Amino acid sequence: MNFVKVLFFISACILIMLSAVSGAPEPRWKVFKKIERMGQHIRDGIIKAGPAVAVVGQASTIISG
């Protein structure tokens, strides 16, 4: 009997959580959008730094001989 009550309570909680997510997805996904944007900034920074790193590598090989 207690197991049935616990199972019903867990099912009700999951149903409420799913309805809350589908009802208002904007605030919940805002955190993930910020993380995604931060990853894009890091990727863009690496792409922009690529030629500079290549020049430094060439300069060090020229200096080394």
Swiss-Prot record:
Its main location: secreted. One of its GO terms (biological process) is antibacterial humoral response. GO terms for cellular component: extracellular region. Transmembrane segments: none annotated. Keywords: Antimicrobial, Immunity, Innate immunity, Secreted, Signal. Induction: Induced by A.niger alpha-1,3-glucan. Pfam families: Cecropin. InterPro entries: Cecropin (IPR000875). It is found in: Secreted. Belongs to the cecropin family. Has antibacterial activity. This is Cecropin.
